[in-house]
Amino acid sequence: FDADNRLDRHYVEEMNKAFQSGFRILTSYRNSVNLADNWVSSGSALWFIRESRFLNNSRMILGSSCHVGGTGFMFSREVMRRNRGWKFHLLTEDLEFTMDSILHGDRIGYCGTAMLYDEQPVTFQQSWRQRLRWSKGFLQVFRYYGMALIKRAVRERDFSSVDFTLLLCPFTVLGVIRIVLGLLFVAFGFVTWQSQLSAIAGWAFDIVLAVVTMMALAALTIVAERDHIGATNKELFAYVLSFPIYILSYMPISFQ
């Protein structure tokens, strides 16, 4: 974990219990110390709480591998020896470590009773720089590990490989490229304006639906994890409304 992280008093005890149950790699519940500061910190904090509660917890229930985050995880000496230390140096080395472990057949566990408190960015500029690194890191990991994951998914019928191939795939970039190509096809006379306007109208509806879904997801996260979130109901209502802005800002970030 990072030097500025705070740990629940039972963190090490709970992680050790999970480790003793047989997992060689474990991640924990990633909470935040400053969720209530503003809409930027709340967006990041809710994202990580959602990942812990609904993604990693669900993967554990399904018997699939979980995703190691940038802090709050552990691995055995055996894994360290196999990797000859820490050999991961892409921009998102936590994600690289996750993909490498899956390709080695490891199942990464999640310990929801071990809670870590991380500090989130409080200005949009800080958040932009952080997520720009993440976006570029995802593309790096997809470049180096994407085909290997696809091959493992097909040959081994490994659900974790399918899961994380979809996680790495840059769908936002592909979606915007599709719109640009549509406009170019119209300009060169390959397709009609009417067909593209119809498609754009469909995309506009999808964006509205996505915004509503994002707010619902933020609200669901807050309701499910209310006991672990230190903010007033008034603040949380505002952060539900601002959550889609935080998420949609990934679109321009992805193209830098």
Give a label for each model feature.
Residues 1-6, 86-89, 101:
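The conserved acidic donor/metal-binding loop of glycosyltransferases
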Residues 5-7, 31-34, 96, 115:
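A short, conserved beta-strand element in the Rossmann-like catalytic core
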Residues 9-91, 132, 139, 143:
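Long helical/loop segments within the catalytic core of UDP-sugar-dependent glycosyltransferases
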Residues 46-53, 129-149, 214-220, 256:
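Catalytic core of nucleotide-sugar-dependent glycosyltransferases
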Residues 63, 98-117:
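Catalytic donor-sugar/metal-binding loop of nucleotide-sugar-dependent glycosyltransferases
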Residues 70, 110-111, 117-129, 143:
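Catalytic cores of eukaryotic secretory-pathway lumenal/extracellular enzymes that build
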Residues 91-97:
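Acidic donor-binding loop at a coil-to-helix junction in glycosyltransferase catalytic cores
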Residues 167-256:
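Membrane-embedded multi-pass helical conduit in multi-pass membrane proteins
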